[in-house]
Amino acid sequence: MDITNRQAVLKNFLGNSPDWYKLAIMGFLIINPLVFFFVSPFVAGWMLVIEFIFTLAMALKCYPLQPGGLLAIQAVAIGMTSPHQVAEEIANNLEVLLLLVFMVAGIYFMKQLLLFVFTKLLLNIRSKTILSLAFCLASAFLSAFLDALTVIAVVISVSVGFYTIYHNVTSNHSDKDITDDSGIDNQDSHETLEQFRAFLRSLMMHAGVGTALGGVMTMVGEPQNLIIAKSAGWNFADFFIRMLPVTLPVFICGLLVCLLVEKFKLFGYGAQLPERVRQVLTEYDQQASAKRTKQEKMKLIVQAIIGVWLVLALALHLAEVGLVGLSVIILATSFCGITNEHSLGKAFQEALPFTALLTVFFAVVAVIIEQSLFTPIIQFVLQASPSAQLSLFYLFNGLLSSVSDNVFVGTVYINEARSAFEHGIVSLQQFELLAVAINTGTNLPSVATPNGQAAFLFLLTSALAPLIRLSYGRMVYMALPYTLVMTIVGLLGVEFLLVPMTEWLTQAGWISLPHITNGVAIPH
């Protein structure tokens, strides 16, 4: 059936997104200029922020780059902010963009080593409780130094690989489509497959939460951490130590939750790896190990050495994070024999869409700054006592981060806190405590929904999710015990431990106060 030009344009607009979503975005684009010119720029600015958060919350309907980008382009076009202000925001956060471009691509070339590690963990640890703890710890450690998306991508690769192997064997190799269970006609095999799915679901959730537990601890664990660290003038060690009063109790309690939900089979956890599946996977791994050539073994050794360089370079702050990532790309590709341009290009595919989206974030942040949108909220919070300010910043960040992207939320709040410090509203010591509250508030409660954690959203939209029956609702349900414990322990840490522990660490000489010159914080 022929369609009109108008219908063709509507079908092309935002692709396969639902019609109601397309109409909503078009409505935003029509209403925003009218409100800006005829009602109030302040109201129009807040409408833009809410609309942008809406596009982030609806990420499963349409990747936020397109609708959010259209809103940002219009905001610049009608004068909500200027191209110069947007360029300034991007320049201020160039380190973060380099982190995403080079570090994520660098870790892509270390995937063989990471796959090897997680495969050995899964097959060699027979206790499900210990295995869950190992996955959580491994994900936390890796996410403290690497990109959380890459870590979760590796765990997804392991899980999809194992699922494919077992599915093909149990369907007698007759069913090449692993999404189709019709080739499995045995009831026992169906039950075993369901148990295997439950087993993989729980492991993926433990790994996902592990990325949050480790990611909050270091300045490279999450993109917003680097923005916060730069604003406060902290290096890698400073950031890690300053976060410890909150992150260490949360980390310990997070691991306890991991043990308890597995031991008592709560919230969908506790499923064991079926023995039949273990036999199939072990046989496959033994065959793969036997076929591994000396060249492939040397690649694993080289990648392990590069991993040590990565940790040392970050811990000792030998170079900017993005440049360390670039060095990983050069070393890994040189010594693993990857010299084809097409092969190099694949490494950048994962990070560039999010890098583009982050640039759109900065355009919206420019609007927030230009229109002073958060000034009333910040003034309200800063009227409270210093200790109450910390809890309020933590809670406001946590609430927004659980429904929106935590990079966006963290960027907005650290900019406002920095502005309050520069205008003499808060002291330097209080600003640094607020930076800790903002970082932990942005990272910890955001595990509540896939919208808050990029790693969770990546898992939900991956090829693995439908295979193991991991829906949005099930993900929220399985994350609930972690959400409650991490949020509450984090709040208690901010309220009762942060100030006395920071004072003790300062007196002990573990941390020093930076001085600020020309608007940039520089550590002593």
Curated annotation (Swiss-Prot):
Recorded GO CC terms: plasma membrane
TM helices/strands, residue ranges: 13-33, 98-118, 140-160, 239-259, 304-324, 325-345, 358-378, 448-468, 479-499
GO MF terms held by the record: sodium:proton antiporter activity
Superkingdom as given in the UniProt entry: Bacteria
Catalytic reaction equation(s): 2 Na(+)(in) + 3 H(+)(out) = 2 Na(+)(out) + 3 H(+)(in)
Membrane topology: Multi-pass membrane protein
Cell compartments where the protein resides: Cell inner membrane
Keywords from the named record: Antiport, Cell inner membrane, Cell membrane, Ion transport, Membrane, Sodium, Sodium transport, Transmembrane, Transmembrane helix, Transport
A Pfam family per the record: NhaB
Function: Na(+)/H(+) antiporter that extrudes sodium in exchange for external protons.
UniProt family annotation: Belongs to the NhaB Na(+)/H(+) (TC 2.A.34) antiporter family.
Name used for this protein in its record: Na(+)/H(+) antiporter NhaB
Gene coding for it: nhaB
